[in-house]
């Protein structure tokens, strides 16, 4: 019988079906993404979050291991509780919404995480300030790559003449 490949080796390499990556590199990638990510386990305890300076909501290491319901304000608790109940039961897999916050457009999504056998592992959340993306869409502000390069070259030439 063939030995199962380890998912993490002594060099902190993570081995996935789709390739390998060093744990410090993956952590850096996750903290480079200009959005915030978080994870609550199957017991609804807050376990992990990205820490990249692009936060809409402040997160603190002291909240790790705490029940997620206690981390939400009273008005949101019933909705969070119902969503988690649906995630646990498998009747809902995701929930997403937009919200206006201090003049910014915030996109928030929650995903139920299941293993290959359907066992509930927890809830993954994604929060992002999409204000600039929305403005780009509204103004059709798209710069074709070649035009951007030509503009940069023109700017460099004009500085060379000064």
PLM regions: where:
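Short low-complexity stretches enriched in small and charged residues
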Residues: 2-4, 20-27, 63-65, 77-83
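Juxtadomain coupling helices with adjacent low-complexity linkers
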Residues: 2-7, 11-12, 19, 128-162
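Generic signal for short, ordered secondary-structure residues
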Residues: 5-12, 16, 22-23, 47, ...
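Short, contiguous hydrophobic alpha-helices characteristic of membrane insertion segments
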Residues: 14-16, 25-26, 67-75, 144-149
């Amino acid at each position: 019988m063939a030995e199962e490949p380890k998912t993490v080796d002594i060099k902190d390499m993570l081995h996935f079906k789709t390739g390998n990556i060093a744990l410090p590199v993956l952590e850096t990638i996750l903290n480079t993404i200009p959005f915030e990510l978080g994870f609550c386990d199957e017991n609804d305890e807050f376990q992990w979050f990205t820490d990249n300076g692009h936060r809409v909501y402040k997160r603190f290491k002291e909240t790790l291991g705490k029940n997620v319901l206690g981390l939400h304000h009273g008005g949101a608790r019933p909705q969070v509780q119902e969503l988690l109940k649906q995630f646990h039961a498998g009747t809902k897999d995701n929930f997403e919404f937009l919200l206006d916050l201090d003049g910014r457009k915030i996109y928030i999504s929650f995903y139920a995480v299941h293993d290959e056998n359907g066992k509930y592992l927890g809830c993954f959340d994604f929060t992002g300030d999409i204000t600039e993306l929305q403005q780009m869409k509204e103004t059709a502000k798209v710069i074709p790559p070649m035009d951007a390069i030509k503009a940069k070259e023109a700017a460099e030439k004009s500085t060379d003449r000064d």
